[in-house]
């Protein structure tokens, strides 16, 4: 009981979360609560308990069992759907963290919009809608294009653009299907004003109420009317940071976020930056890894430090760019061939296939996991954003995926 350990709630999938576990384990011995016994997580953990992560009582019982065996120094999650559980546990044990009210406000986008408006943080007009008719009425007030989204989902699940009244039946069905799986922190669907302009996120670290904006992530989107994030690029010293940092800080204050890493999404509209949402955790799609490669700041390690009540090291040591780009199949069908053709790979940090030969490839986002359409991804680095994007384009152009619409016959 002499050593103090960091409790992780929900590890997530290894391809996108292993780097977070590695960094956290390098900072502190780890305990884990997850919905299955550890496999890939085992080298990083000292002890674990299994629990249904959607059941607050089960998670609390698992944490209490670990607390009886170990001295817990902090509680951390990078899973959007475990944020409330982590906040409640930190409060239960008197550990550093965000109060559940603040985390709940970040999770529920309807509450977020209310708090942004009260604090004069530029955001989007938003209305909770309970039916197709209510969505039509709200869209008439807001104007087209508009956006339908579940109130408390993540990963662009169920988020869809509505260009006209005739689009509403189809887009409402998409948003409603997504809302069925969003978790207890938010209910139903929001109809929101469409914010036109490039999408970015600000990666921040908050320690005892003081926020540092570490980096800007510039995003690429695709697959209209969906808002699929097809790529991200981080550049050290991005000049946009000085413009958007105060808005990100104001958004976190409005919600009451006082500790941890946050991923603050915005659109750069003609009227200036405006908030999309705040995720009170490290960004997905390896964004924390991009920040580390570009700036030298390790957000995963900083998250572990803050969770344990320690001052995070946010000193930049690199002056580069890093980018990730997603690979998609050319059509729907069965994957018959995949190959990364030879080329100049000195700037390629990592390439990962997500579909094997024989797998079904789709271009239709799922209502539970819209990134099901991805066939792979590449991470690259460069001396500038332009260089990184050029290197990324080269790698993705060399990635060959072929599909057939005919299911191969069994031998």
Name each model-derived stretch:
Residues 1-102, 133, 359-360, 368-373, ...:
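ATP-binding N-terminal substructure of ATP-dependent carboxylate-amine bond-forming enzymes
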Residues 143, 268-274, 369-372:
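A short, glycine/Asx- and small/polar-enriched loop/turn
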Residues 122-124, 145-148, 161-197, 216, ...:
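Conserved ATP-binding module of the ATP-grasp superfamily
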Residues 166, 192-257, 261, 268, ...:
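ATP-dependent carboxylate/phosphate-activation module, predominantly the ATP-grasp catalytic core
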Residues 160, 193, 236, 374-382:
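Short, well-ordered beta-strand elements within core beta-sheets of diverse protein domains
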Residues 92-158, 165:
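A conserved helix-loop-beta module that forms one wall/lid of the active-site cleft
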Residues 30, 118, 304-411:
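Peripheral (often C-terminal) accessory segments that flank ATP-dependent C-N-forming ligase machineries
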């Amino acid at each position: 009981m002499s050593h103090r350990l960091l409790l992780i709630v929900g590890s997530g999938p290894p391809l996108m979360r292993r780097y977070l576990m590695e960094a956290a384990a390098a900072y502190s011995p780890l305990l884990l609560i997850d919905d299955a016994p550890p496999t890939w997580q085992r080298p990083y953990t000292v002890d674990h308990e299994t629990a249904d992560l959607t059941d607050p009582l089960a998670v609390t019982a698992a944490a209490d069992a670990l607390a009886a065996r170990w001295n817990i120094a902090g509680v951390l999650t990078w899973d959007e759907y475990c944020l409330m559980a982590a906040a409640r546990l930190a409060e239960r044990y008197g550990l550093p963290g965000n109060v559940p009210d603040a985390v709940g406000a970040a999770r529920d986008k309807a509450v977020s919009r209310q708090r942004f408006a009260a604090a004069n943080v530029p955001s989007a007009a938003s209305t909770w809608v309970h039916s197709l008719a209510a969505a039509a009425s709200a869209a008439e007030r807001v104007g087209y294009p508009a956006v339908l989204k579940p109130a408390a989902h993540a990963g662009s699940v169920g988020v869809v653009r509505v260009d006209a009244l005739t689009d509403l039946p189809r887009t409402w069905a998409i948003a409603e299907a997504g809302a069925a799986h969003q978790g207890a922190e938010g209910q139903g669907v929001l109809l929101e004003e469409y914010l036109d302009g490039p999408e970015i996120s600000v990666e921040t670290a908050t320690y005892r109420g003081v926020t540092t904006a570490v980096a800007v992530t510039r995003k690429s989107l695709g697959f209209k009317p969906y808002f699929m994030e097809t790529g991200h690029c981080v550049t050290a010293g991005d000049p946009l940071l000085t413009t958007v940092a105060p808005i990100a800080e104001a958004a976190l204050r409005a919600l009451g976020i006082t500790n941890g890493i946050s991923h603050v999404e915005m659109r750069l509209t003609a009227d200036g930056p405006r908030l999309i949402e705040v995720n009170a955790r490290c960004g997905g799609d390896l964004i924390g890894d991009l920040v580390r490669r570009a700036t030298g700041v390790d957000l995963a390690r900083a998250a572990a430090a803050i969770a344990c009540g320690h001052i995070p090291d946010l000193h930049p040591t690199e002056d580069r760019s890093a980018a990730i780009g997603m690979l998609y199949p050319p059509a729907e069908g069965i994957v018959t061939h995949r190959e990364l053709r030879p080329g100049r790979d000195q700037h390629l940090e990592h390439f990962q296939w997500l579909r094997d030969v024989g797998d079904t490839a789709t271009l239709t986002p799922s209502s539970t996991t819209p990134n099901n359409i991805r066939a792979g991804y590449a991470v690259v680095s460069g001396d500038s954003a332009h260089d990184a994007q050029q290197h990324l384009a080269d790698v993705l152009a060399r990635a060959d995926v072929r599909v057939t619409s005919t299911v191969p016959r069994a031998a």
